[in-house]
C-alpha cells in the first residue's frame, strides 16, 4: 500500500474518529495532535507553541510573508521570522517528512495542500448534518444544543479561515478534495468502508501506472 490519506472535516462530523479507525484497520500510522509533537521535535520549538497556533486563522499579510519565506528557503533566516511563520513552516515540513515514511492518515492542518503534488495522496473531506453534529458535540462536552451549535460555528469558521489563507483552495468545497463524504448518511463505520474502497481503486490505478 502506498496511499497517504488526508482528512479534512467539519467540526462534529466524527472526522477524527473516522481517521483513527481507518488507520487502525489498515495498520498504518495516524497523525492528528501527533503531528504537532512531530513538528515540535523536528524543529526544536516548544510543543505548546504548536498547540496555541493550531489551525488558528491568520491574516493575508502574514500569509504572504510565510509563503515568500518558504519559496526562497528559510534555513538561514529562521531566527528572524515571526513566531507564526516558524510554527507554520515547521508544521508544513513535518507533514512532508511524515509522507516520506510511508502510508498514513493525517487529519487537518492543510495536509492535502502540503502534499498536493504527491501522486499517492487521497484527500478526503468529511461533513455531517448539523443536528448530528450538535448532538455529538453536546454529548461530548455536556453542552446545551444552543451552546454546541455556537461552538461548531466558531470552530468551523476558524478552520475555514486557516485553510483558505494557507492554500489556493476553499475549505469544505468539493473541488478542493478527491472525495467528500457525509457521515450522517453512511455512519462512522460506513464512511470508513467507503474510504477503504476508494483506496483500493486508487491503489489499483497506481499499480497499473507502474506496470506500464
Residue ranges, per PLM feature:
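Pre-Walker A (Motif I) flank of P-loop NTPase domains
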Residues: 1-10, 102
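Glycine-rich phosphate-binding P-loop
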Residues: 7-20
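ATP-dependent small-molecule kinase phosphotransfer cores
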Residues: 40-103
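Small-molecule kinase domains that catalyze NTP-dependent phosphoryl transfer to phosphate-bearing small molecules
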Residues: 55, 59-66, 70, 144-188
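NTP-dependent small-molecule kinase module
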Residues: 92-96, 165-212
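RNA pseudouridine synthases
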Residues: 98, 111-117
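Conserved phosphate-donor/acceptor-positioning beta-strand/loop module used by diverse small-molecule
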Residues: 117-139, 145-153
Amino acid at each position: 500500500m502506498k496511499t497517504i490519506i488526508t482528512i479534512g472535516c467539519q467540526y462534529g462530523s466524527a472526522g477524527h474518529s473516522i481517521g483513527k479507525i481507518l488507520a487502525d484497520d489498515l495498520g498504518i500510522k495516524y497523525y492528528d495532535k501527533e503531528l504537532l509533537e512531530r513538528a515540535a521535535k523536528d524543529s526544536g520549538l516548544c510543543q505548546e507553541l504548536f498547540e496555541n497556533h493550531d489551525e488558528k486563522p491568520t491574516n493575508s499579510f502574514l500569509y504572504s510573508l510565510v509563503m515568500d519565506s518558504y519559496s526562497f528557503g528559510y534555513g538561514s533566516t529562521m531566527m528572524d521570522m515571526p513566531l507564526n511563520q516558524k510554527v507554520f513552516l515547521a508544521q508544513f515540513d513535518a507533514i512532508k517528512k511524515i509522507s516520506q515514511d510511508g502510508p498514513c492518515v493525517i487529519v487537518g492542518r492543510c495536509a492535502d495542500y502540503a502534499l498536493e503534488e504527491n501522486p499517492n495522496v487521497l484527500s478526503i473531506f468529511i461533513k455531517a448534518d448539523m443536528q448530528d453534529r450538535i448532538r455529538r458535540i453536546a454529548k461530548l462536552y455536556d453542552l446545551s444544543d444552543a451552546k454546541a451549535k455556537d461552538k461548531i460555528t466558531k470552530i468551523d469558521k476558524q478552520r475555514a479561515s486557516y485553510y483558505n489563507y494557507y492554500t489556493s483552495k476553499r475549505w469544505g468545497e468539493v473541488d478542493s478534495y478527491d472525495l467528500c463524504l457525509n457521515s450522517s448518511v453512511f455512519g462512522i463505520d460506513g464512511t470508513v468502508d467507503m474510504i477503504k474502497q476508494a483506496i483500493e481503486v486508487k491503489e489499483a490505478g497506481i499499480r497499473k501506472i507502474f506496470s506500464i
